[in-house]
């Protein structure tokens, strides 16, 4: 949501108001993430601000692409090394890089296509060439690739000098 740290003794509502963030949406997302839910409750849905939710998702994409994935790559290299002499480690890193590219394309697709579609819907315009099920098919492919990467590492990479770091990276 772009809320800065160091908000002191302010309540959630006060912080959200100061940061111009919809409080109900913030709380719904925070509860969603902290309880590992797979969907919002029926009671939460009418309270959600779709524009605030889209802003959150755009910020999450930026955080993931610019911070999380590069950090994971560094940790992966640190855990498995990455010399061309170690073919398995080199292939794992190449697979990771392909995965990152797919994630980047997926998030760009969401930012450009899905969010534009939702924004148009909010404005009362329906694009009959696009529907949300098209978007859903993109998500399952990314999840499958991540599981595949984890499977490859746990099944084929046996030479880790730092198993704790590799486990933490996974």
Name the predicted role of every residue range.
Residues 1-170:
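Small-residue-biased structural context
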